[in-house]
A protein has these predicted regions:
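Alpha-helix C-terminal capping segments
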Residues: 1-10, 82, 109, 211-221
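Short glycine/serine/threonine-rich phosphate/pyrophosphate-binding segments
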Residues: 1-6, 21-24, 69, 97-104, ...
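Glycine-rich ThDP/TPP pyrophosphate-binding loop and its adjacent helix/strand module
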Residues: 79, 83-106
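Active-site/ligand-binding loops adjacent to catalytic centers
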Residues: 42-56, 110-204
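Small/polar-residue-rich loop-to-helix segments that shape phosphate-bearing ligand pockets
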Residues: 11-87, 142, 152-170
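A glycine- and small-aliphatic-rich helix-loop capping segment at beta-alpha/alpha-beta transitions
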Residues: 3-14, 18, 106-114, 141-144
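Buried hydrophobic positions in well-ordered alpha/beta secondary-structure cores of metabolic enzymes
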Residues: 4, 27, 79, 91-92, ...
Length: 240
């Protein structure tokens, strides 16, 4: 919506009708035409694609556009540079549609080809327990996402019951030798409260990564000796 406003383009934004009011206000402020859609994010995507297929607009979804992953991979390039051309021992990545995880795979593969890495860093894929088609499939050794409902969760940004790139995400996580975790609602909210005490006000979806870190740290105290990166992708005002 912001880029379209700057370019003088009409922007149609499709959102779940349950989206937080704070997110809605940001979109409205840019003058976008808002289409609230009943159901989960899959229903939203279907409605947007239908409009695009009718030739009325271009569907600028970050999920389907392959160039988007060329952008998310640079996040990991920056981390490599900031750590002196090395990578942390462990990443906790929140995953719904998988844009960050797929970008990580591109970055790691290219860094290995260039001689900066000898192997993939360890990756933990994090999902909300209320909506975890990928984590469930991974734990069960399945190649396709497990059936899931569009259940309500405070981590609305990763509540994707049928991720379009689900098979690719599972293949990618296994190729990297990663693992998967789920966190429940109270674990997410508790993690968010702790982050706030550190001066980091994040949206609830972002807190899911820290919740997984806290959970795994309780099981494996030695994790405190590792270099760990937790992406905090969204500001707190987005979910309040």
């Amino acid at each position: 919506a912001a880029y379209a406003a700057r370019a003088g383009l009409t922007c149609h934004v499709f959102l779940p009708d349950s989206v937080s009011r704070s997110k809605l206000k940001q979109v409205e402020s840019y003058g976008a035409i808002i289409h609230p859609i009943p159901g989960g994010r899959s229903a939203v995507s279907a409605a947007a694609m239908e409009m695009a297929e009718n030739g009325q607009c271009y569907y600028a979804s970050h999920v389907y556009n392959p160039l988007f992953y060329e952008g998310t991979k640079t996040y990991f390039f920056e981390i490599c540079l900031q750590l002196g051309l090395t990578m942390p021992d462990l990443f906790f990545l929140p995953v719904g549609n998988g844009t960050l995880l797929l970008g990580a795979y591109r970055a790691f593969t290219q860094l290995m080809a260039a001689g900066y890495l000898s192997d993939y860093p360890r990756v933990v894929m994090v999902q909300a327990a209320a909506c975890s088609p990928l984590a469930t499939a991974y734990a069960g050794g399945q190649a396709v996402p497990a059936p899931a409902e569009a259940a309500a969760t405070v981590a609305e940004g990763i509540a994707i019951p049928a991720p379009p790139r689900g098979v690719q995400i599972l293949e990618t996580l296994r190729a990297m030798g990663g693992t998967a975790m789920t966190v429940d609602e109270e674990e997410i909210l508790a993690a968010r409260r702790e982050l706030s005490l550190h001066g980091l006000y994040v949206e609830k979806t972002s807190a899911a990564s820290f919740a997984a870190y806290r959970k795994l740290s309780a099981q494996r105290p030695e994790l405190g000796q590792s270099t760990v990166v937790l992406p905090l992708c969204g500001a707190g005002l987005k979910s309040d």
